[in-house]
Amino acid sequence: MSENSTVKKNVRVRYAPSPTGFLHIGNAQSALFNYLFARHYHGTMVLRIEDTDVKRNVPHGEDSQIDNLHWLGIDWDEGPDKPNPKYAPYHQTERQDLYHRYITQLLDQGLAYKDYATEDELTTMRDQQRAAGEAPHYDGRWYGRSVADQQAAEARGLKPSIRLHLPANHEYAWDDIIKGHVAFNSDNMGGDFIIEKSNGMPTYNFAVVIDDYLMDITDVLRGDDHIANTPKQIAVYEALGLKHPNFGHITLIYNPKTRKKLSKRDKETLQFISQYKNQGYLSEAIFNFIAFLGWSPEGEDELFSREELIERYDPARMSKSPAYFDQSKLDWINAAYIKRLDLDDMTDRVLELVDEGQTDVARQVKALQLPDLRTLTSQVCKIYQTEIHQLSEIMDKVLFYVTILQEPLDYDQLRQFDRTATLAVLTAFRKHVQALPVDVATPDFKKMIQTVSQETGVTGRNLYFPLNVAFTGDHSAPQIDEVLRLFANSTIIELLTKAIAHV
């Protein structure tokens, strides 16, 4: 690590998404590590919107990014919603005059030049280079061309792009916060590169330099797919006579099956934070999980609050190796956080998912319009809190129990047990339920099960498994006496009658 990267005074970092869609887990990883870095060093986190690629921007893409960052618990100190007059605006499309000012400076100094090459000419150039066994690169054909040549191109209706001229055999190097020393030679960077497109819009590698400089960004943490961009950005800094910030390149997230970078084509893995939210993953669990995708603390503990992660964060423990997305680990972490929830909090979170109606099961539960939905949801949460990995499973259970008389239960499981004992248990239990006074709102089902056991002489699995099948369709159901509280007595009697008919 460089000496500069260990000096952490007045730290300013930025997360700079493009409003091109939902918050991807890879982008969330970058946002999270910038957040931890800023908070650990008591610095400033900036949210900047890189929206110059207008064709790729989607309606409400920015709002979606911001909403999901808030849901994760990632906040910032400056941004479109928290402008600092010294650094605003925070949308690149609103900063065009700033970029053009520096473009003009480079043109005036002869460090950049206009390129009128057409796309067809550039394609032919690259094809010829490949045919000659060369790596495609810009050959500098418009560097040093006369004003007359430029005027002739203008007369043909051509609009120039602007390229930064790279000195030959020049090293662009930095001491990466994560990767260590990294160096590129200018001869292997594809030639002079475009810093302003022919439509007048700056390229990413130019605009980001101007923004980071003017916003006093001290440390740039981003995915290691940006490593090839960094020497180009350093070239811009050097051309302008500016000091570049510290760079740190975070390992990307990989699919453990293919051993390749996680791709949006990997349908087996949820890609977007909103999908995890809608499935009932807790924000604190997702935060905890992502923090381990590229970093690890000292010790063996794996469950940490945001505050603990901020305290323990150390960039020296960032990994250089790929981070593999372990779905089973995420499910384990989420289950652990669900177990910690207060019952009312858990109920609130499930009902919020129902109200938002972003999944089929949420919409189905919402459509039931149950007047006692909160009570029912709370009861189901109490029964299954230690059994589930996602809050969506609670919605599944609520829907199942409300519609259980229409559900095709697996009565074949009843044949695994002694037929005589099963009939005795189910029949005796039905008799006791039928005998309940109408005004008994909450029967003591645990005591009733004990009474049936005493009357029939049936105990253990031969007692409980048939009851589990009758009321859940699964012989391994938890807390059957609590499950029974979900039903009206008439429903219990009907379920017992159906089960008896299948013995």
Swiss-Prot record:
InterPro entries: aa-tRNA-synth_I_cd-bd (IPR045462), aa-tRNA-synth_I_codon-bd_sub2 (IPR020751), aa-tRNA-synth_I_CS (IPR001412), aa_tRNA-synth_I_cd-bd_sf (IPR008925), Glu-tRNA-ligase_bac/mito (IPR004527), Glu/Gln-tRNA-synth (IPR000924), Glu/Gln-tRNA-synth_Ib_cat-dom (IPR020058), GluQ/Sye (IPR049940). A motif ('KMSKS' region) lies at residues 261-265. This is Glutamate--tRNA ligase 1. It holds the Pfam family Anticodon_2. Disulfide bonds: none annotated. PANTHER family: GLUTAMATE--TRNA LIGASE (PTHR43311), GLUTAMATE--TRNA LIGASE, MITOCHONDRIAL-RELATED (PTHR43311:SF2). ATP binds at K264. GO terms for cellular component: cytosol. A motif ('HIGH' region) lies at residues 17-27. It comes from Levilactobacillus brevis (strain ATCC 367 / BCRC 12310 / CIP 105137 / JCM 1170 / LMG 11437 / NCIMB 947 / NCTC 947). Catalyzes the attachment of glutamate to tRNA(Glu) in a two-step reaction: glutamate is first activated by ATP to form Glu-AMP and then transferred to the acceptor end of tRNA(Glu). Keywords: Aminoacyl-tRNA synthetase, ATP-binding, Cytoplasm, Ligase, Nucleotide-binding, Protein biosynthesis.
